[in-house]
A protein has these predicted regions:
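FabD-like malonyl-/acyl-CoA
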Residues: 47, 76-80, 94-247, 285-294, ...
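Helix N-cap motif at beta-to-alpha junctions
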Residues: 239, 267-272
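Short beta-strand
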Residues: 37-38, 76, 192, 253-258, ...
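Gly/Ser-centered flexible loop/linker motifs
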Residues: 242-260
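Acyltransferase
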Residues: 233-234, 284-370, 374-378, 398-421
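Short amphipathic alpha-helices in soluble, non-transmembrane regions
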Residues: 246-248, 272-282
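A generic structural motif
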Residues: 261-267
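Phosphopantetheine-dependent thiolation modules in NRPS/PKS and related acyl-activating systems
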Residues: 2-96
Length: 423
């Protein structure tokens, strides 16, 4: 994974409020580990900071300031000055209630589907209804003539079949985001979890609706026809512990890094059962996700050739909005083309990295979960910090209606009464 450090090396320590205090504290801790003082621009490796001491420094940071960073960030910001600036950027600041809302849209992925999803909002919001029908029309040619609107309103259990789940979630994400934009809530950045990246790419300006509809529908159809026997296991383990528990299981791998102690594994069901047993013996909570296959894992490889052939016929563009990739864990710095979407099928979801970078680099006041029900909210709250962005879902389940939507728009200072609220 390639991650780009925030800010240029050698930036002045007072460029970011709080960096100077972080720098002084870091130099004190580094002197304790190294047995001698070092300068703010001395590279840690050159000073002799080994991996054990670096892990100790990470522990000191977490104990004093909370989960601001990952252990690997100490390698990415390899001097006290650079690390201090990054810590200052990561530190949540109290919101100024008079400051303008800066919302980032985060699109939910597979696993949040349920019968009648967003049906209440469809019936009571003309804005949402219009955009959902627009997305449904774009998908119909690739779904054998079936409409995702019919699937939603009928409560059809086919919504749990991958060939329909992915297009339905794409349509919902697209419609919810367009409805918010139409009401005046414009995102400063976007990100998506797994298949949620397709709606994020459309809203971010990298893909037209019809091209994204083609890709996501065929992606789901190809995956639907894979042999049964795969699954996904959500765990309360750290990435390191989950990887350790999966050692010796060749068809089990980490498929999502959602937050600290929130790691998902994908693989064959027998292997997942053995891993779950090992984790349970250590008191680590585990639960199986309601999915039919081992998504975001090498077991998806059989899909790749067919999907790549389709994706090559769709010209992917560069996003116009900052797009935080959960493939790389950082802001996209090139086009979201066939190579990107093909890679996305088998790569793990680096959700935690993407959200941390989004928050550090864009300072949103709100993280808005775009999906039929909130499943990412706990991770967003942990990643944003206690005093960081407010986290809110657009939908809380199938009964979400126009009244609930009005509350969301009010929180985002959008909607028909935005001017009066801001006065």
């Amino acid at each position: 994974m390639t991650r780009t450090p925030v800010g240029a090396a050698g930036a002045a320590p007072d460029e970011e409020p709080g960096a100077e205090a972080f720098g002084a504290w870091l130099l004190e801790r580094l002197a304790a580990y190294l047995g001698r003082p070092i300068g703010p621009d001395t590279p840690f490796a050159e000073a002799g900071l080994d991996s054990v001491a670096a892990l100790g420094l990470y522990g000191d940071i977490e104990e004093k300031y909370g989960p601001l960073i990952d252990p690997t960030d100490i390698q990415l910001y390899p001097t006290a000055r650079e690390l201090a600036r990054f810590l200052a950027l990561r530190t949540p600041r109290p919101l100024n209630r008079r400051s303008r809302v800066r919302a980032a849209f985060v699109f939910t992925g597979q696993g949040c589907q349920h019968p009648h999803l967003t049906s209440g909002l469809y019936l009571h919001s003309t804005g949402y209804r219009g955009h959902l029908e627009e997305a449904a029309d774009a998908l119909v040619p690739f779904l054998g003539g079936r409409s995702v609107v019919e699937l939603i309103l009928s409560g059809d259990p086919a919504v749990h079949q991958t060939a329909f789940t992915q297009p339905v979630l794409f349509a919902i994400g697209y419609a919810l985001a367009r409805m918010l934009e139409e009401s005046g809530a414009l995102p400063v950045a976007v990100a998506g979890h797994g298949v949620g990246e397709y709606a994020a790419a459309v809203v971010g300006g990298a893909l037209p609706l019809h091209d994204a509809a083609r890709l996501v529908a065929l992606r789901g159809a190809f995956m639907q026809h894979l042999p049964a026997g795969g699954g996904m296991l959500a765990t309360g383990a750290t990435a390191e512990r989950a990887t350790e528990a999966a050692a010796g299981e060749p068809d089990v791998s980490v498929s999502a890094y959602n937050a600290n102690r929130a790691t998902v594994l994908s693989g064959g069901l027998p292997g997942l059962e053995r891993v779950a047993g090992r984790l349970a013996a250590d008191g680590v909570a585990c639960r199986y996700l309601r999915v039919a296959h081992a998504f975001q894992s090498p077991l998806m490889e059989p899909v790749v050739p067919r999907f790549a052939a389709v994706a090559r016929r769709v010209p992917g563009g560069s996003p116009r909005l900052p797009f935080y990739s959960t493939v790389t864990g950082a802001a996209a710095d090139g086009p979201l083309d066939a190579a990107y979407w093909t890679r996305q099928i088998t790569e793990p979801v680096r959700f935690a990295d993407a959200v941390r970078h989004l928050v550090a680099e864009h300072r949103p006041t709100h993280l808005v979960e775009i999906g039929p029900r909130p499943v990412l909210l706990p991770f967003l709250r942990r990643l944003g910090g206690a005093e960081g962005p407010a986290c809110l879902p657009v939908c809380r389940g199938p009964r979400t209606n126009a009244v609930d939507l009005a509350g969301v728009l009010s929180a985002l200072e959008a909607g028909p009464f935005a001017g009066a609220l801001a006065a």
